[in-house]
Every structure is written in structure tokens, then in C-alpha cells.
């Protein structure tokens, strides 16, 4: 198969339709100037063959292949090649029937890329398979040798050279297919894993589950059948029992009615006898009362009198105690309250007095200063009046004296300046001498000083790092000590908490979570544990108010409560308060205010206001405490409870309860502390425990955080201490060195120089000031009279100003003093009131003591009265015993009458029992009749099978089948049926069949895939072996031709392909070249032309091994000289007689050997092609073809491309 003609339209430089006809079946050459479009012909062939790497056709995308990228009005590129297919041996698969094959490829800008084979649309894969089947794989082309291919072959690595051999041997396609097959196997493997996962995770568990459900379903059916059998037996037995009960009840009813009549007769006889005995006893008692009745009455009257006296004294004692309690609690409380309020005022006044006193002190100091200023101004005025003048220090002196002092200052300054000048000069000379000496000994000191500075910097760096750690030295030890202390506290508090909890088992609400992921916040807890008492004195009252509700459980909703009751496994009975459903009522503010106005605001409170609780618990607390008032005393409670405006239940602090319905409860209470008081103690311990545990956790957390920091800090500190020691040693060494001493002397001299210079400067300033002052004084001396008048006037002004200021300060101070005195008086008054309150409280306490003494005296009187009552009771009892001694006959008759009454009572009980039984039998009889009727109505089979009930050898044989046991069995079976019925899957049988079918189907598909995989792997193994054999044969053949061709092109030389050292042919191949008898280590030892011949020889050897129908060479002779080029051309002509060559070359030696030569030109921006047929000697005929517009139009109808 070879190229016959090419049609190019809009492709690269071929703007117009260009037909290139008359290709020689063997050797064709293309030549032309650079840029004329000769390589574009080869690019068009590659484009048609389906090249994917567009860089090989010098383009970045398909749009670049269109003439001028579509900018010149041409929007598509089309290439059409006609192949000669007369040689059926080289025909592509499936095209043996065609003598010619025309393949067209077209790309449209912004459109799609399409192929046509013989005018029919085809996809890319089909075109690729067509060309690959004849060895024209353009994406791995051994038949295409483009510009630079020789260089590329020279740079190939061993695996790449092996790939060329594989391509020539035809095993490359197998490798590609093998890789594709392996990827397919991997995908199938993934599918197998997916199937296995589905089997393991879905189907198999489903089958197991359905099998279990099938067992449950079969068991359910079995139970249903047994229930049906036992139900009939049990219903038959109940029917028989009901009929027997109906008959038996009627008989027993008649017997009981007869018994009642007999018992009533006996009772009437007993009643008659009791009446007779009563008359006899009354006559005997009348006789007894006449004899001893007077003494008994007098004793009874004495007892009654003693009891009245006892009650009166006891009431007086109770009233005294109550008054004493009210007095102590109310009056003393008021005094203490007033005392505390005054104490607060006293504290505030003391602070105010302190503040004003501080202000007074400031004014006194200011006033004192103003007085001193006034005194000084007065003295100055007096001095000026006397002819004196003030100097700079404020001292009074004459002008002459001041002028003399200025002269002395000037003289003193001149002397000090001369001394400083001499000292400066000496120090400067000494400094120069010492500096020269120091320079000589500078080396060693400098080195030590540098070392000291380096250590100092290291030390500073360590200090910075330590500072960055933000760790305080000893912090870890503090935390460890704190942790030990907190651990002890936590253990102590936990023991105390557990001990207190053990004493209150009723306050523990334990339950099991009713469901998974249960939110414990839904259960708030017991009412007792949810409140806190504001005042401990109210604990008893609050406990009475709450009563049993103190142990109720508060939850968020009724659903939570239901779940707790059903599934919480509570150990005892609890009442539950759901916050969303509880109906709570609370006394209104108006009612509470009425009660407070009635007995005093501090004497009554709503129970709800005396407890603390969370806001979300408002409804529950109103339900428990919202409708009861708490009063301080019984009197106040009574007033509040029965007031018509209030009429509300009230409880006293002592626990006594008053109810508006008229009931009163109270009395002695347990001496043990209130539950709420102990509970408050428990809460305090719990709160403290939580706080300590939180603090301990924070300490633990901080210790964990500090762990790494402490370690790092210790390391840095150790390094810092070492550096500090090193720095101290170096500093000591520096200080002890002679250089250091000399340096100190130098510093001392420098300081002396600075001091001397400063002294010189100061003396000059002093001298200058003194001279200026002398001039001023001299001027004053000359104008003494005018100056004196001016100073006198100024002194008078200063005096007046100072006097005014002193008077004003004194006035302010006095006003402030008065204010302080007033406050001090108030303060003293308040202190006296505090003392008075204390005395009044002591007086109240003494009065309480007197009250207590009176109460003790009254208690003694009560005790005496009780003894008198007891004595009267004893005498009355004795008298009654005497009387009873006379009553034996009465007793006997009374005993007989009593027995008769007891007999009547017993008979009455029997009658009632019989009446009850009659009523019961009537009911049983009616129930049995109704039951029989209902059963006949409900179970239609009873009427037809009634005659079999209880008969032997039937399904209703009650002797063989115990009906009671059948009933128990039936009950158990029904429970089991209910349990199974909730979970049994009625569709289990069908679902199991479907699941098993799906399982079997998947297993079948899995086996098929595994078998296919096994066969593919076996085939790959066999083909790998054949591939290796074919590869060895190809290598040997190519190697032989490679050496032969290279020897021909370069006489005296030899070449071969050999595997790299230590590897096999299957790992790769590399070039081995010998010039003469010397084998070169690598190709770098050869010249450029020799290397090119090596690569070209290999390419030609490949072509000889498995000739492709077409070979394309693009300037492969570019790097060769003319002699080598001519040799190549002759070799192609003489040795390759079975393939078509299309060669692009610029050298005569190459294209003169071609049978047909195509020459390209670039005319008016468009490429054109001319054909020249050449003879054996290289001459050319004039039969050339040009692609012009006229020829294009003539052939367009015949060769137009389907667009």
C-alpha cells in the first residue's frame, strides 16, 4: 500500500486547493527553499495519519493548522490522501476488496474534527486501527524520520532503543493491549471486591437475618395453631363451668334464704331475754345508788374542780411563754435592727468626718503659710522703711554691704578658676602618658574583654529566652504544694459529702437511663435538692409546707416522667412533677400585702419567697410553696388564716398549721435538726467540693501546660548560671589585670578633666553674674532715693496682698472648723445612741429573764395542780372499786345480757354474710347466664359441638387435657405470640427466596469474572513468552543489518546493539561502535557525522526488518557531508525495493536518486508544488504539474471533500 496522490486545502501555507499527483511507488523526493512549504507536505501526511502530539507538526493546537489561523477568510483545513491497495498482502484489515483507499481529515475553526474513509464518516479509532494494521502508527512512528530524529535516536536511553525494536517486531501494540487488559483486570478486581463487599455486608447478613425471621415466622405459625386448639378447649371448659355455676347458684340461693329466716327467729328470742335482764339490772342499780351514790358524786366534782384549775394555770403558762417569745423576738429584733441601721450611719459619718478633717488640715497648713508670708512681708516692709534692701537670698542688707559681697564672690571665683586650670593642665599631661602605656598592654585585655562581652551577650540571650517562657521561678513547686492541699481538701469534703448522703437515703433519686443517648438534664431532681433556704429559722415551717411534695421528682415534660416510670427501674414509688403540665397556683401580691398589713411586714411571708431556686423551676415551686403563708407566731397565724380577705393555709415557724377549714395541727416536734437544714449543710459541702475539684482540675491543667516549659526553663537557667559563673570569673580576671587598673586611672583622669572644665565654666558664670550684680548695685547706689521709694512701694503692695490672703485663709479655716465640730457632735450623738441601744437590749434580756422566772414559778404551780388532779383521780377510782364490789349480781346479769347481745351480733353478722352471699350468688348466676349467652353468640361452633364437651376420646376430654393447665399454657402462648408478632416479618419467606436468588446470581457472576481473569492471565503469560522470543529474533536480525549497513556507510567500522552491563535484552539496548578493531566506550568519542551515521544505520536496519509500506524522511542528511548523502541515496534506491520513500532534502546527492522529485515554491504568500519525473541518471522531464486555479476547478467535482 503506497501514496498515489495528496489533496491539500487550507492546510498551513497551502491556502488554495492543491493536488499533488503522480507519487512514485518507490522513491519520491521533495525539495525547495526554506519556508516554501516542503515540510508542510509531510505535516499534512502526519495530520491525516492522526498524530496526537501536535508539536511534531509544529503546532500548539488544531486551529494553528488552518491557513493563517483562519484570519484570511479560510476557516477549515482539509487533507485527502489516496492510497494504492492493489497489493493485497499489504492491505489493511477489512479493506482487501478495495483497490484504492481514500482517507480524508478535516478540521474546522471552532468546530469539530472529522475523518472520512472512502467518503464515509469514520471515528478516530477506526482510522488509527486502519493505519496501525499496516505498521503506520503515527503516535509511535518508526516509519517517520523527522528533522532531529537522528539526534533523538542518538540521545535515546536503552529502554527507548528497545521500544524501537519492539515497534519493529510488532510487539508494541501487544504491550499496549496488555496494559489495557491489565487495567481492565484491575477494574474487574475492584468490581469483584465490590461484589464481595456486597455479599459480606449486605446480602449474607440479610440472608442470615431472613433465615432467623423465617424461623420466627414458622414458630409464630406453630404457636397460632396451638393457640387455636387450646382456645377451643379452654372456651369449652369455661362454657361448661358457666352452665354448672348457673344451676348451682340457684340451689344454694334457696338454702341461704331458709337459713336467714331461722337466724332472725333466734335473734328475736335473744332480744326479748335482754330486755328482761335490763329491767332487773336497772332495779339493782337504783338500790345501789341510794346507798353509795353521794360519795361518788362529791369525788367526781372534786376531780372536775382540780382539772379546771389545772387547765387555767396551764393556759396562763402557755400565754406567758408565748408573750415572752413574742417580746424577745419582736422587740429585741427591732432594737437590733435600729442599732445596725445607726451603726451604718455612724460608719458613714466617721468617713465623712475623716474626709472633712483632712480638708481642714490642708486649710490649716495653707493658712499657716499665708500667715508666715504676711509676717515675712511685714518684716521686709520694716527693713525697707529702715533703709535696708533685700538681696537674692531675701536677706536685708545695705547696698554697700551687698557690693562688698559681690567683690568677694568675684575674687573667690578667680582663685577657683586658677586652681582648676592648673589641675586641668596636669591631668591632661598625665592622660597622654597613661594612654601611651595602655596601648602597649592592650592585646590580652582586649581578648579577655571580648570573651567577657560574648559571655555577657549569651547570658542576656538566655535571659530573653527565659523571659519569653513567661515562667515564674518556683511556680511548679507552688502548684505541686497547692495540688497536695487541694487533694486533701477534696478527699475530706468527699468523705463528708458521702457521710451526709448516707444519712439521707430518701434524698437520692437513682434511675436507669430509659433510652440510649439519654439527656440527664431532662430530670431536674427532687424538690428538696432543688431549693436553698434563705433563712435557717424558717426551715421547719418550709418542711411542713412542702410535706410529702418535698420528695417529688421534677422533670421537663410528662413524656420524660412516663419513660422514667416505665423504663427507669425506680427502686421505690415516686410522684413526678412535669414542668410543662403542672397546674400551679400562687397567692397574689394583694393577698400577701393584706396579710403583711394585718400582722406586720416582718411577721408573715409567702413560703415561696423564703426559698431560692432556678427560674426554670418556677411552676414546680409555685405548686409546692405558692399557696401557703409562714407566720412567726400562732396568734399571727390565726389572724391571717381566718381573716375573710385572706382565708389561706398558714404555718408557724414552729411547724404548727392553721387551715381556714377549721383544722389545726401541731404539737411536739422531733428534737433533730430539720431535713432542710441538714440538706442545706449537704449543699454547702457539695458546693465547696465542686469548687475545690474545679480548682484542682485547673491546677492539674496548669501543671500539664507547664511541664515542657519547666523543663526548658531549668535547662536555660542551668545554662544561665554557668554563663554567670563564667562572666564573674572573666570580670574578676579583667579587674585584677594591670590594664584594668591603668584603665581605671585613665577614667579617673578623664573625670578630673571633666570636673576641672566644669569648674572653670561655673567660675566664669559666677564671676560674670557677680560683676553684673555689682553694676546693678552701683546703679542703685547712684539713684538711692528713687530706688528706696520704689522698693518701699513694692513692699507695701506685698504686705497688703499677704494680709488679704492670710485673712481669707483664716476665714475658710474657721468655717471648715465649724463644719467639723458639727459633724463631731453628730458622731458623738450617734455613739451615745449605740450605747443606749445596747442598754435597751440588755434591759430586754433582763426582762426576758424575769419573764422566765415567772414562767418557772407558774410551771411549778402547774405541776402541783397536776398532782392534785392525779390524787382526785386515784380517790375516784378507789370509790368506784368499792362500788363495783357491790355489783356482782349486776355484773352477772350484765354479763348474761352481754352474751346475748354478742350472740345477736354474731347472728346479725351471719345474716349479713348470708345476704352478701345471696347477692353474690345472684350476681354469679346472672353473670354465668350472661356468659353462657355471650359465649354462644361469640363462638358459633359451641352450639354444634356442645354435646362433645367433657366427653372421653374427643378434643374436649377434660380428663386427658387439663383445662386449667391449658389456660395457663394459652396465656403464655399469647404473650409469646404478642412478643413475636411485634417483630415477626410476614414476608420473610418471599424475601429470603429473593435474597438467595440474588446471592446465587452474584456468586455466578463472580465465578465468571474470576474464570475470565484466570484465562486472561494465562494468555498474557503465554504471549509474554512468545513476545520475548519474537523480540530476540528481531534484535538479532536488526543487530545484523545494523552492523552491515554501518560498515557499508563507513567502511572499516562496525556497530551493534547490546544490553547494558549486568542487564538482559528485555531491560534495554545501547549502541556499541568499533572503528577498526577498537570498540568505543560511548558515542561521545565519535565525530558528529559518525554519530549521525550510527543513528541512520539503526533506522535503516529497522526498516529492513519489517518494512512499512511508506517511509517519510525529513532532512535526515542535514548533518552529513555530500559523499555520505550520495551513499544514502544510492542505498535507499538499491536496497529498499518493497516500500515507498518520501524524502525531504536540500542536497542533490539525495534527491537526484529519486524517481520523482517535487519542488515547492512560495508565491504570493501561498505554497505551490511542481512535479518532475527523473530517470536513472538524474535527468528530469518537462512533465510537471502545477496547482493552479483552473486545474482545481476542473477536478473539484471529481475529488471534492465532503464538508
UniProtKB/Swiss-Prot annotation:
Which regions form coiled coils?
A: 172-513, 670-1032
Provide the GO MF annotations for this entry: ATP binding; ATP hydrolysis activity
Please give the function described in this protein's UniProt entry. Answer: Central component of the condensin complex, a complex required for conversion of interphase chromatin into mitotic-like condense chromosomes. The condensin complex probably introduces positive supercoils into relaxed DNA in the presence of type I topoisomerases and converts nicked DNA into positive knotted forms in the presence of type II topoisomerases.
Task: Give its localization.
Answer: Nucleus; Cytoplasm; Chromosome
Residues annotated as domain SMC hinge:
522-640
The written remark on domains in the entry is: The SMC hinge domain, which separates the large intramolecular coiled coil regions, allows the heterodimerization with XCAP-C, forming a V-shaped heterodimer.
Residues annotated for ATP binding in this entry: 32-39
Where along the chain is composition biased (Low complexity)? 1174-1185
Keyword set, alphabetical order = ATP-binding, Cell cycle, Cell division, Chromosome, Coiled coil, Cytoplasm, DNA condensation, Mitosis, Nucleotide-binding, Nucleus
Please give an example of a GO cellular component term from this record: chromosome
Similarity comment: Belongs to the SMC family. SMC2 subfamily.
According to the record's subunit comment, the protein's assembly and interactions are: Forms a heterodimer with XCAP-C/SMC4. Component of the condensin complex, which contains the XCAP-E/SMC2 and XCAP-C/SMC4 heterodimer, and three non SMC subunits that probably regulate the complex: XCAP-H/BRRN1, XCAP-D2/CNAP1 and XCAP-G/CAPG.
Q: What is the name of this protein? A: Structural maintenance of chromosomes protein 2
| BP GO annotations | cell division; chromosome condensation
Q: Which SMART domains match?
A: SMC_hinge (SM00968)
- Using the UniProt annotation, give all residue ranges assigned to the region (Disordered): 1174-1203
The UniProt record lists the keyword Membrane: no
Q: Which domain of life is it from?
A: Eukaryota
Start-end of Basic and acidic residues biased regions: 1186-1203
UniProt xrefs under InterPro entries:
P-loop_NTPase, RecF/RecN/SMC_N, SMC, Smc2_ABC, SMC_hinge, SMC_hinge_sf
Amino acid at each position: 500500500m503506497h501514496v498515489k496522490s495528496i489533496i491539500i486545502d487550507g492546510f498551513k501555507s497551502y491556502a488554495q486547493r492543491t493536488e499533488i499527483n503522480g507519487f512514485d511507488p518507490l522513491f519520491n523526493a521533495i525539495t525547495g527553499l526554506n519556508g516554501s512549504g516542503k515540510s508542510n507536505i509531510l505535516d499534512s501526511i502526519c495530520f491525516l495519519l492522526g498524530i496526537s502530539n501536535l508539536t511534531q507538526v509544529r503546532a500548539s493546537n488544531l486551529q494553528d493548522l488552518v491557513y493563517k489561523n483562519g484570519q484570511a477568510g479560510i476557516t477549515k483545513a482539509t487533507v485527502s490522501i489516496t492510497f494504492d491497495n492493489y497489493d493485497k498482502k499489504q492491505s489493511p484489515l477489512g479493506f482487501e476488496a478495495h483497490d484504492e483507499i481514500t482517507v480524508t481529515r478535516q478540521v474546522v475553526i471552532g468546530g469539530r474534527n472529522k475523518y472520512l474513509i472512502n467518503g464515509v464518516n469514520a471515528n478516530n479509532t477506526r482510522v488509527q486501527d486502519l493505519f496501525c494494521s499496516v505498521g503506520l502508527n503515527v503516535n509511535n512512528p518508526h516509519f517517520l524520520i523527522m528533522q532531529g530524529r537522528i539526534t533523538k535516536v542518538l540521545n535515546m536511553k536503552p529502554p527507548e532503543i528497545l521500544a524501537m525494536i519492539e515497534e519493529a517486531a510488532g510487539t508494541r501494540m501487544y504491550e499496549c493491549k496488555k496494559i489495557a487488559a491489565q487495567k481492565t483486570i484491575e477494574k474487574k478486581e475492584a468490581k469483584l471486591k465490590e461484589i464481595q463487599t456486597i455479599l459480606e455486608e449486605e446480602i449474607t447478613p440479610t440472608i442470615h437475618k431472613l433465615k432467623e425471621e423465617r424461623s420466627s415466622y414458622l414458630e409464630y405459625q406453630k404457636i397460632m395453631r396451638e393457640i387455636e386448639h387450646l382456645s377451643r378447649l379452654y372456651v369449652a371448659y369455661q362454657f361448661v363451668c358457666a352452665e354448672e355455676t348457673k344451676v348451682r347458684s340457684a340451689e344454694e340461693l334457696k338454702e341461704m334464704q331458709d337459713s336467714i329466716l331461722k337466724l332472725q327467729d333466734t335473734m328475736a328470742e335473744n332480744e326479748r331475754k335482754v330486755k328482761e335482764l335490763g329491767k332487773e339490772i336497772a332495779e339493782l342499780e337504783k338500790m345501789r345508788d341510794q346507798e353509795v351514790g353521794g360519795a361518788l358524786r362529791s369525788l367526781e366534782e372534786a376531780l372536775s374542780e382540780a382539772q379546771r384549775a389545772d387547765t387555767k394555770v396551764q393556759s396562763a403558762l402557755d400565754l406567758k411563754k408565748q408573750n415572752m417569745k413574742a417580746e424577745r423576738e419582736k422587740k429585741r429584733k427591732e432594737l437590733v435592727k435600729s442599732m445596725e441601721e445607726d451603726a451604718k450611719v455612724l460608719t458613714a459619718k466617721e468617713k465623712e468626718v475623716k474626709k472633712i478633717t483632712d480638708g481642714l488640715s490642708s486649710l490649716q497648713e495653707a493658712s499657716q503659710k499665708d500667715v508666715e508670708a504676711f509676717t515675712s512681708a511685714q518684716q521686709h516692709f520694716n527693713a525697707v522703711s529702715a533703709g535696708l534692701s533685700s538681696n537674692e537670698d531675701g536677706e536685708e542688707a545695705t547696698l554697700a554691704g551687698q557690693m562688698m559681697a559681690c567683690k568677694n564672690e568675684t575674687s573667690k571665683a578667680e582663685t577657683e578658676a586658677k586652681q582648676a586650670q592648673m589641675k586641668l593642665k596636669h591631668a591632661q599631661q598625665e592622660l597622654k602618658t597613661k594612654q601611651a602605656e595602655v596601648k602597649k598592654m592592650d592585646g590580652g585585655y582586649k581578648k579577655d574583654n571580648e570573651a567577657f562581652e560574648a559571655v555577657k551577650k549569651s547570658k542576656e540571650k538566655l535571659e530573653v529566652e527565659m523571659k519569653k517562657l513567661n515562667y515564674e521561678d518556683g511556680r511548679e513547686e507552688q502548684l505541686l504544694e497547692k495540688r497536695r492541699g487541694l487533694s486533701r481538701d477534696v478527699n475530706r469534703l468527699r468523705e463528708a459529702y458521702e457521710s451526709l448522703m448516707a444519712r439521707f437515703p430518701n434524698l437520692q433519686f437513682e434511675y436507669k437511663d430509659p433510652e440510649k443517648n439519654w439527656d440527664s438534664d431532662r430530670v431536674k431532681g427532687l424538690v428538696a435538692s432543688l431549693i436553698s433556704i434563705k433563712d435557717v429559722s424558717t426551715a421547719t415551717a418550709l418542711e411542713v409546707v412542702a410535706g410529702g411534695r418535698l420528695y417529688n421528682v421534677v422533670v421537663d415534660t410528662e413524656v420524660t416522667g412516663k419513660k422514667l416510670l416505665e423504663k427507669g427501674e425506680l427502686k421505690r414509688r415516686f410522684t413526678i412533677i412535669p414542668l410543662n403540665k403542672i397546674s400551679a397556683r400562687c397567692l397574689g401580691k394583694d393577698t400577701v400585702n393584706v396579710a403583711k398589713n394585718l400582722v406586720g411586714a416582718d411577721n408573715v411571708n409567702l413560703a415561696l419567697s423564703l426559698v431560692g431556686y432556678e427560674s426554670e423551676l418556677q411552676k414546680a415551686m409555685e405548686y409546692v410553696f405558692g399557696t401557703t403563708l409562714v407566720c412567726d407566731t400562732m396568734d399571727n397565724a390565726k389572724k391571717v388564716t381566718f381573716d375573710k380577705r385572706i382565708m389561706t393555709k398558714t404555718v408557724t415557724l414552729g411547724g404548727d398549721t392553721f387551715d381556714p377549714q377549721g383544722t389545726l395541727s401541731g404539737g411536739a416536734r422531733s428534737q433533730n435538726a430539720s431535713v432542710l437544714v441538714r440538706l442545706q449543710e449537704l449543699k454547702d459541702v457539695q458546693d465547696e467540693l465542686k469548687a475545690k475539684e474545679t480548682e484542682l482540675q485547673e491546677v492539674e491543667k496548669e501543671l500539664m501546660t507547664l511541664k515542657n516549659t519547666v523543663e526548658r526553663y531549668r535547662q536555660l537557667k542551668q545554662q544561665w548560671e554557668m554563663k554567670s559563673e563564667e562572666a564573674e570569673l572573666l570580670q574578676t580576671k579583667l579587674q585584677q589585670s594591670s590594664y584594668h587598673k591603668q584603665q581605671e586611672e585613665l577614667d579617673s583622669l578623664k573625670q578630673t578633666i571633666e570636673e576641672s572644665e566644669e569648674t572653670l565654666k561655673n567660675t566664669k558664670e559666677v564671676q560674670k553674674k557677680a560683676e553684673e550684680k555689682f553694676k546693678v548695685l552701683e546703679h542703685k547706689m547712684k539713684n538711692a532715693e528713687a530706688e528706696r521709694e520704689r522698693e518701699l512701694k513694692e513692699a507695701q503692695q506685698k504686705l497688703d496682698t499677704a494680709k488679704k490672703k492670710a485673712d481669707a485663709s483664716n476665714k475658710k479655716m474657721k468655717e471648715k472648723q465649724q463644719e467639723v465640730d458639727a459633724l463631731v457632735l453628730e458622731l458623738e450623738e450617734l455613739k451615745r445612741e449605740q450605747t443606749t441601744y445596747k442598754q435597751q437590749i440588755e434591759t430586754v434580756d433582763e426582762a426576758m429573764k424575769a419573764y422566765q422566772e415567772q414562767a418557772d414559778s407558774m410551771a411549778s404551780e402547774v405541776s402541783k395542780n397536776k398532782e392534785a388532779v392525779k390524787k382526785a383521780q386515784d380517790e375516784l377510782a378507789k370509790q368506784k372499786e368499792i362500788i363495783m364490789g357491790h355489783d356482782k349480781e349486776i355484773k352477772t346479769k350484765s354479763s348474761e345480757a352481754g352474751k346475748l347481745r354478742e350472740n345477736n351480733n354474731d347472728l346479725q353478722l351471719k345474716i349479713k354474710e348470708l345476704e352478701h352471699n345471696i347477692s353474690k350468688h345472684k350476681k354469679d348466676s346472672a353473670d354465668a347466664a350472661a356468659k353462657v349467652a355471650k359465649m354462644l353468640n361469640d363462638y358459633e361452633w359451641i352450639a354444634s359441638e356442645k354435646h362433645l364437651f367433657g366427653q372421653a376420646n374427643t378434643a374436649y376430654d377434660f380428663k386427658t387435657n387439663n383445662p386449667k393447665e391449658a389456660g395457663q399454657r394459652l396465656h403464655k402462648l399469647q404473650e409469646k405470640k404478642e412478643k413475636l408478632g411485634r417483630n415477626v416479618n410476614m414476608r420473610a419467606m418471599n424475601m429470603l427466596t429473593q435474597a438467595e436468588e440474588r446471592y446465587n446470581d452474584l456468586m455466578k457472576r463472580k465465578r465468571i469474572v474470576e474464570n475470565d481473569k484466570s484465562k486472561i492471565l494465562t494468555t498474557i503469560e503465554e504471549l509474554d513468552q512468545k513476545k520475548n522470543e519474537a523480540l530476540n529474533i528481531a534484535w538479532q536480525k536488526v543487530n545484523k543489518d545494523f552492523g552491515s549497513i554501518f560498515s557499508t556507510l563507513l567502511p572499516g567500522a562496525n556497530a551493534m546493539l547490546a544490553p547494558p552491563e549486568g542487564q538482559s535484552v528485555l531491560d534495554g539496548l545501547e549502541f556499541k561502535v568499533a572503528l577498526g578493531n577498537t570498540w568505543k566506550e560511548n558515542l561521545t568519542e565519535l565525530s558528529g557525522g559518525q554519530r549521525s551515521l550510527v543513528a541512520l544505520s539503526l533506522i535503516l536496519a529497522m526498516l529492513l526488518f519489517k518494512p512499512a509500506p511508506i517511509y517519510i524522511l525529513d532532512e535526515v542528511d542535514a548533518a552529513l557531508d555530500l559523499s555520505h548523502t550520495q551513499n544514502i541515496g544510492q542505498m535507499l534506491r538499491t536496497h529498499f525495493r518493497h516500500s515507498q520513500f518520501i524524502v525531504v532534502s536540500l542536497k542533490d546527492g539525495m534527491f537526484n536518486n529519486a524517481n520523482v522529485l517535487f519542488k515547492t515554491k512560495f508565491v504570493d504568500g501561498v505554497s505551490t508544488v511542481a512535479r518532475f519525473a527523473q530517470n536513472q541518471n538524474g535527468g528530469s522531464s518537462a512533465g510537471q504539474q502545477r496547482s493552479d486555479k483552473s486545474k482545481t476547478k476542473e477536478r473539484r467535482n471529481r475529488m471534492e471533500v465532503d464538508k
